[in-house]
């Protein structure tokens, strides 16, 4: 067809669509660990892999900042195959359970003749969060505030006037796509439906609003829709758990196709439809590569209605008609075979039946209105799993604990909630309460998770002996063995007992062969034991699993020898200028969490030297912490001083280890105002507001000339303490210190609006005029306010 089967946007016009802002239309968007991908506009690590069969894979990888999970996608083209194969992997690098979603969204060109191609068993679609539902393809009610009661085919783009999402209910088919009737071509996605649960279409709509967004996002390439394919999820939001150090992987395929139109079934090899034209049946077949002597067979009850042989290629789809001879069309079975008798694709019509339309989701009840402790726990867990923005899961856990203080699940959940927010000591009694209930009648519980979590709360407090005991008890449960043995090996390394560490890391890997962090730690242990050849063999094997295992690549360098510099050069080439500083910190922490502080320092200094010493402040705080844990207090203080001198712009610590770093910096350098400021940022982001405000107040005591901490303190005073006058005073001082800072301008404007201080605001507005002009929302609000009170502007 000589066409772009994925929407090709010839210009880059970023719009404020993505979770963190900039976003462009076109191509295939990969949304993870949530929608839209927070790092959409950030660089990614990449490499190219070539194979003997002529296929080429481009790998992209990142360790994302929000939840510290790792995602990889390998894009492969094969000679003679008309599809793009995507091999994807997601890996939880953390010691705690995490959640993720993965939606791969190709954009496709749309016109009035475009329609979506959902599987034939899809009879209903959901809105986001399943808050609304519609029959499909014929909508018969109100959906997105549009009245479709007359019966409207919403699979057709021309029938959807407003921005609309719809996601299919469960399907037993492996495909979803879209088709342009005017050019007889479309795009199809194929993946195993057991994993690929999500099948969705999104459009800006064909009305005025949609056309406005066409202009926002492109100059000349026109409207598009997104065909969204969800792996391990069927809705947005819909999140799946990744247990500590767990990896999930899958394959998915995107392909152009022609002639078939409304697909009835598809595989990565072939796409087919079977339809009725008056008294005849028709088969249309498309294949993604060249096949000789393909057999098309249509039968019913042992009787053959079509049996034909064709040479196939993507350039030449086949259409075959056959007489029905009175047979019930929906009882026909279609099979397509290659010349070896292997089934390429098959289809048997769905039974005619009226399927029920599912109910939309219901909002969570207030905790006091939920009768059972189990439902309180499950509601709280759902809110955590789905990252709900307004409901607080702890309200449900604590309501349950008020009724039954020893409940295992809610105590464990509360402990995890606090652990995720850096409250290691506060989490400990909840885990202990869960364990007390578990062992009341049996010292050997079936569930080892509370022991494992207790181990981590103790380890993060530096209570290694107690943590060791808790982790060992957790290994009595098979579900915790891989993560608990890994934690034991870390403590063994901290104790310099590398023989015992090797025993434990091997047990961990037996339970989780793809634990990339355990592989790095085993390489480190083997090096420490002088078993360099075994370490090199392990590293080679590990890199065949994950080329972006930076810890293993660094270990290859640490092994020394003639190839050491080459190993370092290859690692640095992979971690080129696109690699985030946060990834360097992550990989350094992999070493530090096992007491390998010298190795952690060497790795992080690569970033420092690469940037001539001018780096993100947390780099030096990490280096200071590594020195402090190595009992080199003078070096630690020197690093902490350097950290305090780095530019504080956009420094938002969010790693649990960074709490320990900043607390240690405050211990050794109590007058470091920036360390208090950064720690306050962590606490506020973790919704530990009292701790945040206390840290910011201490920062201001030490340095009241830093406008951002004053601005942050104002937010805390106003939103969490109802200290409105103090909040306004902080903002006014922040603005006086630096009136060019846009957010202080906007925040002060907003706060004054709450006080009704309009003319004071107008007077201050001139000074910050060009700032608010740059911040469009602030500029519009300023003008709106002046107009409302009779003040003109120019």
Sequence positions of predicted segments:
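A contiguous, surface-exposed recognition patch within enzymatic or periplasmic domains that forms
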Residues: 3-8, 14, 93-101, 105-247, ...
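Canonical tetratricopeptide repeat
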Residues: 413, 453, 487, 521, ...
């Amino acid at each position: 067809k000589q066409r772009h089967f994925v929407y090709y946007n010839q210009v880059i016009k970023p719009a404020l669509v993505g979770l963190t802002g900039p976003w462009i239309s076109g191509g295939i968007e990969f949304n993870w660990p949530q929608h839209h991908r927070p790092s959409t506009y950030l660089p990614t690590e990449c490499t190219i892999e070539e194979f003997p069969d002529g296929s080429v894979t481009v790998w992209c990888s990142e360790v994302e900042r929000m939840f510290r999970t790792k995602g990889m996608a390998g894009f492969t083209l094969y000679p003679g195959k008309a599809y793009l194969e995507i091999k994807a992997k997601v890996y939880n690098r953390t010691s705690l359970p995490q959640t993720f979603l993965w939606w791969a969204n190709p954009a496709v060109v749309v016109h009035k003749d475009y329609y979506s191609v959902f599987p034939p068993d899809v009879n209903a679609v959901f809105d986001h969060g399943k808050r609304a539902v519609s029959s499909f393809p014929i909508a018969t009610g109100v959906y997105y505030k549009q009245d479709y009661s007359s019966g409207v085919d919403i699979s057709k783009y021309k029938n959807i006037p407003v921005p609309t999402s719809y996601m299919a209910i469960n399907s037993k088919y492996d495909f979803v796509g879209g088709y342009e009737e005017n050019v007889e071509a479309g795009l199809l996605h194929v993946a195993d439906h057991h994993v690929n649960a999500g099948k969705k279409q999104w459009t800006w709509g064909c009305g005025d609003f949609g056309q406005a967004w066409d202009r926002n996002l492109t100059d000349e390439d026109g409207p598009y829709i997104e065909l969204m394919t969800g792996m391990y999820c069927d809705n947005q939001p819909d999140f799946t758990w990744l247990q500590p150090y767990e990896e999930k992987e899958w394959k998915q395929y995107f392909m152009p196709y022609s002639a078939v139109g409304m697909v009835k079934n598809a595989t990565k090899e072939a796409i087919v439809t079977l339809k009725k034209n008056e008294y005849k049946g028709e088969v249309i077949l498309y294949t993604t590569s060249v096949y000789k002597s393909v057999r098309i067979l249509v039968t019913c009850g042992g009787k053959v209605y079509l049996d034909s042989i064709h040479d196939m290629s993507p350039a030449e789809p086949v259409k075959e008609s056959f007489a029905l001879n009175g047979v019930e069309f929906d009882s026909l079975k279609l099979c397509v075979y290659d010349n070896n008798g292997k089934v390429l694709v098959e289809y048997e019509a769905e039974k005619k039946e009226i399927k029920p339309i599912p109910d939309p989701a219901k909002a969570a009840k207030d905790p006091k209105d939920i009768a059972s402790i189990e439902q309180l726990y499950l509601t709280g867990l759902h809110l955590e799993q789905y990252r709900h923005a307004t409901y607080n899961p702890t309200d449900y856990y604590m309501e349950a604990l008020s009724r039954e203080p020893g409940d295992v699940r809610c105590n464990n959940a509360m402990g995890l909630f606090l652990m995720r927010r850096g409250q290691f000591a506060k989490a400990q009694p909840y885990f202990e309460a869960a364990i007390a209930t578990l062992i009341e009648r049996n010292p050997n519980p079936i569930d080892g998770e509370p022991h494992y979590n207790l181990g981590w709360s103790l380890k993060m407090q530096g209570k290694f002996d107690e943590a060791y005991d808790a982790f060992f008890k957790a290994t009595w449960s098979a579900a915790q063995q891989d993560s608990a043995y890994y934690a034991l090996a870390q403590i063994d390394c901290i104790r310099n007992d590398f023989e015992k560490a090797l025993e434990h890391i091997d047990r961990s890997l037996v339970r989780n062969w793809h634990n990339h962090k355990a592989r790095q730690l085993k390489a480190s242990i083997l090096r420490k034991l002088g078993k360099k050849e075994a370490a090199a063999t392990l590293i080679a094997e590990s890199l065949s699993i994950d080329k972006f295992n930076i810890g293993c690549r660094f270990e290859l360098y640490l092994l020394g020898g003639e190839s050491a510099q080459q190993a370092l050069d290859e690692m640095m080439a992979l971690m080129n200028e696109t690699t985030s500083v946060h990834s360097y910190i992550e990989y350094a922490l992999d070493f530090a969490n096992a007491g390998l502080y010298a190795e952690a320092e060497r790795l992080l200094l690569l970033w420092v030297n690469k940037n001539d010493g001018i780096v993100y402040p947390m780099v030096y705080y990490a280096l200071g912490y590594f020195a402090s844990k190595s009992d080199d207090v003078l070096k630690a203080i020197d690093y902490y001083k350097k950290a305090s001198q780095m530019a504080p712009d956009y420094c938002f610590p969010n790693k649990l280890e960074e709490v320990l770093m900043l607390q240690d910096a405050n211990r050794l350098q109590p007058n470091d105002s920036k360390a208090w400021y950064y720690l306050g940022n962590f606490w506020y982001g973790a919704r530990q507001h009292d701790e945040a405000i206390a840290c910011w107040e201490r920062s201001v005591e030490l340095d009241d000339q830093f406008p951002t901490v004053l601005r942050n303190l104002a937010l805390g005073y106003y939103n969490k303490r109802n200290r409105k006058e103090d909040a306004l005073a902080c903002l006014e001082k922040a603005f006086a210190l630096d009136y060019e800072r846009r957010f202080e301008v906007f925040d002060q404007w907003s706060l004054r609006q709450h006080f009704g201080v309009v003319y004071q605001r107008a007077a201050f507005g001139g000074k910050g005029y060009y700032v608010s002009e740059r911040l469009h929302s602030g500029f519009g609000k300023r003008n709106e306010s002046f107009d409302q009170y009779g003040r003109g502007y120019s």
